[in-house]
Every structure is written in C-alpha cells, then in structure tokens.
Curated annotation (Swiss-Prot):
GO terms for cellular component: Golgi apparatus; Golgi membrane. Pfam families: Ank_2, DHHC. Its EC number is 2.3.1.225. It catalyses: L-cysteinyl-[protein] + hexadecanoyl-CoA = S-hexadecanoyl-L-cysteinyl-[protein] + CoA. This is Probable protein S-acyltransferase 23. The DHHC domain is required for palmitoyltransferase activity. Keywords: Acyltransferase, ANK repeat, Golgi apparatus, Lipoprotein, Membrane, Palmitate, Repeat, Transferase, Transmembrane, Transmembrane helix. The chain crosses the membrane at residues 270-290, 298-318, 407-427, 454-474. The gene is PAT23. ANK repeats lie at residues 57-86, 90-119, 123-153, 157-186, 190-219, 225-254.
C-alpha cells in the first residue's frame, strides 16, 4: 500500500534552540515555519514580501504555519491576503498540513475563514484521511463533530480513513472511527477491507478492535487475490493473528448457542462441568468417606468436621450460583442513558483539548458505543463493558468485576475451605481405617486398589484445593493493592498506571488498611486516585 502522505519536514521550535543558537529565518516561509511573528511582520511590512505566493517548492507560508499550529502567525497571514484554500503542487491545502500534527487551533481558524473541509489532493486525500494516516485522533474527532467531515470518504484508491488508521496501526483512531460506525466492510480497489490491511501490517490490537466491533462478514470477505484476512495472516506467517482470526470464525459460527445462552456460552464455558463436579464430589464424600461400609464407624468429632465440610460445600454452591448470575458491573450502553442529547453523540460535550483526556481514547468502546470508566474493559464473551474488569472466568460463565468480585472471593475461599476440610477428613478416615499395608506396598497404591472411589475423591479434591487456594491468594493480594488481574497483566498498556517518571504507579492504591476496608464494606475497592508525592 503506497502512500502519498505529506512529507513532514522536521522543524525545531524556538523553545528547542540553545541560548547561543537561533533558527535560520530568511524569508516569510521560514518565519512562518518557526512561528516567529515578529520576523514575519518585518518581512511583510518592511521588505514588502508577500504571504500569498508559494516558495520555489510550491509551498505556502500558511501551510507552514498550519503544520506547526502557529495560530497568531496564521491569523496574520490570513489578514494580509493569505488564501485558506491555497493548494501546492499536489493540491494539498493548509488544512491538510494542519491535519499532519493535529493542529486543531489553526484548523478552526482556517475553517472559520472559509477553508473547504472536503478539499482533496491529487491522491483523493481529505484532511480526515491525512489525520487518520498520522494517528491524530483528537483532530479527526474535532472535524467530525464541529465541521461534519465525512469519515467514510474514499480516496482515489477507494480507501477510507479507517483503512489508513488500521494499516498504520493507530488503534486510538481506529477505536474512534468504529465508535462512530465507520464502514468496516468497504473494500478498496484491491478488494481489501480495513481488517485485511491491519492483518497485512500485523497490527494485532487494531485487528482485535475490528473483529470485536464487526460481524462475520468482514472475516469472510476476500480481496482481489481471493484471500480472506485469515488466509493473509497464515500466508504471511502471522501465527498469533491467524489463531485469533480462526477462533473468531469459530465463535461467529456459534450464533445459535449464543442466542440460547445470551452469548455467555458461545465460547468455552466450564460452569456446568464445575457445578456437576462439586455435586459429585459431595456425594462421593458421603458415600466413600463418611458412611463407607469398609471403614470404621465415624466418631462424633470426625462427623462434626464432615458436617462442617458439607455445609461449606453447600454454601460454595450457593455463592457459585450467585457469582454466575450476578451483574459483574456492566456499564450502561448508550441506548440505556438518560440523556437523549448525550445518547445521540456522547462525545459532543467532552473537551478533547483538555490535557487530562490525552491518552484516554481507550475509554471509547466501539461495540457498546459508550465512554466507559477508566478501569473498565469490554468482554468479548459477555459482549458488554464491565466496571473494574478483573477477568472473564469460564468456570462461572461470567465476568469478575466491580459488583460481583466479593462473591467471587467468597466462592473461592469456600471452595478452598471445603476441599481442605473434605480432604483432611478423608485422609484421617482412610489412615485410621486401613490396616498396616504389606511389605513393599505403598499406602497410596493400597488406597487406589481397595478404595478407588475415595482415591478419585482425593484426586479431584486436591486439584480443586490447589486452584482455589491459588485464586484466593492472588485475589487477596490484588484487593490489598487495589488492582485488577487485567491491570496487573497489561500494566504497560495503560497510561494511567504510569507515574511522572514513566515507571509503574498505581494511583488507586490507598494502602492495605483502606483497600481491604473498602472491599469488605462496599464489596469493591474505590476508584479515587492518589496523587504521586513527586508532583505534590
């Protein structure tokens, strides 16, 4: 995919010059490029230089001012005859140049003075194409919201802004365009969709966004060579992408199962298996351990412990049901919002020029069409965004999030306690009830031969104990630090988990005591941020 993108000439602003150095400013073009209004006025008012004529390369002073967002320089040029629609040798206007670095202030000025938002260059690129090529997400959103830029416009090769953002791997721009329902299945002159181009460049995150927000149609569309995105990934040796796309194809085929189980069992789900296993183990515990005819009569103390273990098992089943059925903290979709105005365009009231928004485009969910809380994540299995998303657990067929994490912790604790009490009781009963084994025969071998049902119980009981204890320890550790599994595993991807020095910093960690107290009292840890001491 050849691009005729604007060549960005590296320019150093005055702030980057050393005290003994100054930029070489020889004419209105260099003065505009460096944003030197004083020198520009000198050239125009004393030397009689024109700001409406191009230089030897066909570039205009207003283009240089637009490129570097020099607002006052751009205003001066316009006031002195600069044409906001002046086009260079490849028909690019100052607005095209403003799109390269996302110069929103100058773009506003140009458009307010009559610049054409849909002006095209020789390649058919509009400002929205150029901004998408350079990943200027805020600029793209700004011209869409305020100036109704066509974000599905095609260049001469039939490529939309989404094609370019996917090709160059600008996931934030991809996310914004998908959020605004940009067309995903549009094929360019080579038959490629945005997903094809994301696969060709092995942009994994862009592919993930496109697949989750798309339909089966984009997965099976073929380019002019007859290749689907999956075939392209396989042919180019992109194994990770090929596996992901193959799984997505299988998931889309389970639409009938999705409809029956509300989408939760469309992918691997072990909840019925786990529920059945717990019930079977409880029955085995009663028949092969507590009331086994080939073991001595149970004592009152051991019987009490057995009853306690069974009670824990019953409570574990109750919490299992509750954590499986309870809302994990689904974020309301756009259609569920109270404000009709916000529902029409939830981005319209946000000040994207505010520095606090920088880097937070990941809050947009192109599938749910919502601006989700910072710590939330879209679950492709549940097909919903979940607040304080921890992980999707196939063993409970549900996500673990803000509203059901306490139930999940209780469930794994009860599972660990039940398996510990049951296993301990079983070992005590077998140890006391089995006579001395023959020479050369191990105790375990004797158990397997003489009490196979008890051996099966102990085997699965041990597996459950190891799994639930691991989860209990890991969940307790993360609750104490007020961090989720998703954040812990993907910390490098989240800008809010980095301090001023660029190192890992958890702004939600209020200390062991408060974190645990909040969780016990409210059922979840709070999202109040702690300001790093280094910037206080």
């Amino acid at each position: 995919m050849d691009s005729s993108e604007i060549e960005v000439v590296p320019l150093d602003s005055n702030s980057h010059q050393s005290p003994t150095e100054s930029p070489t400013i020889t004419d209105v073009f260099s003065a505009s490029a460096y944003g030197d209004l004083h020198q520009l006025k000198h050239f125009v008012e004393h030397n009689g230089s024109s700001v409406s004529l191009p230089d030897d390369n066909g570039f205009y002073a207003l283009q240089w001012a637009a490129l570097n967002n020099s607002l006052h320089v751009a205003q001066y040029i316009i006031q002195h005859g600069g044409d906001v629609n002046s086009a260079d040798n490849i028909q690019q206007t100052p607005l095209h140049w403003a799109a390269v670095k996302g110069s929103i202030d100058v773009a506003d000025l140009l458009l307010q003075h009559g610049a054409r938002i849909e002006a095209v260059d020789v390649n058919g690129f509009r400002a929205v194409h150029v901004a998408s090529q350079y990943g200027q997400t805020a600029f793209v959103n700004h011209i869409i919201v305020d100036y109704a830029a066509d974000y599905n416009a095609l260049d001469i090769e039939g490529r939309s802004p989404l094609h370019w953002a996917a090709y160059n791997g600008f996931t934030e721009t991809v996310r914004l365009l998908l959020f605004r329902d940009a067309c995903q299945n549009r094929q360019d002159n080579t038959g490629c969709t945005p997903l094809h181009w994301a696969v060709i460049k092995e942009n994994v995150e862009a592919c993930t966004l496109l697949v989750h927000a798309g339909t089966k149609e984009e997965l099976i569309l073929k380019d002019n060579t007859g290749s689907t995105p999956l075939k392209l990934a396989s042919d180019k040796g992109h194994r990770q992408l090929a596996l992901f796309l193959s799984k997505a194809m299988r998931t889309r085929k389970n639409s009938f199962v999705d409809k029956i189980f509300c989408g939760k069992l469309g992918e691997t789900s072990y909840a019925p298996m786990l529920f059945s296993l717990i019930v079977i183990l409880m029955v085995l515990f009663i028949t092969s351990i507590v009331s086994a005819s080939n073991l001595p009569k149970i004592t009152a103390m051991v019987g009490l412990w057995a009853c306690f273990g069974l009670s824990c098992g019953v409570y574990a089943l109750i919490t299992f049901y509750r954590v499986s059925r309870k809302d994990p903290g689904y974020v309301k979709r756009t259609g569920e919002a109270n404000s009709q105005h916000t529902a029409n365009d939830p981005l319209i009231d946000i000040n994207f020029k505010n520095p606090s928004w920088k880097g937070n485009w990941s809050q947009l969910c192109p599938t749910c069409k919502i601006i989700r809380p910072v710590r939330s994540k879209h679950c492709p299995t549940c097909k919903r965004c979940v607040e304080q998303f921890d992980h999707h657990c196939p063993w409970i067929s549900n996500c673990v999030g803000k509203k059901n994490k306490r139930y999940f912790l209780v469930f794994v604790i009860m599972g660990a306690l039940t398996s510990f009490v049951g296993g301990t009781t079983a070992v005590q009963r077998l140890w006391r009830g089995i006579p001395q084994v023959h020479h050369g025969e191990s105790w375990i071998k004797h158990i397997v031969i003489e009490h196979p049902d008890a051996a099966v119980f102990l085997f699965f009981d041990l597996l459950i104990f190891i799994a639930t204890m691991t989860l209990t320890i890991s969940q307790s550790y993360m609750i104490a630090r007020n961090i989720t599994t998703n954040e812990l595993w993907n910390a490098k991807r989240f800008s809010y988990l980095r301090g001023p020095d660029g190192r890992f910093y958890n702004p939600y960690n209020h200390g062991l005591r408060r974190n645990c107290t909040d969780f016990l009292v409210h059922g979840y840890t709070r999202d109040d941020e702690v300001v790093p001491s280094s910037i206080l």
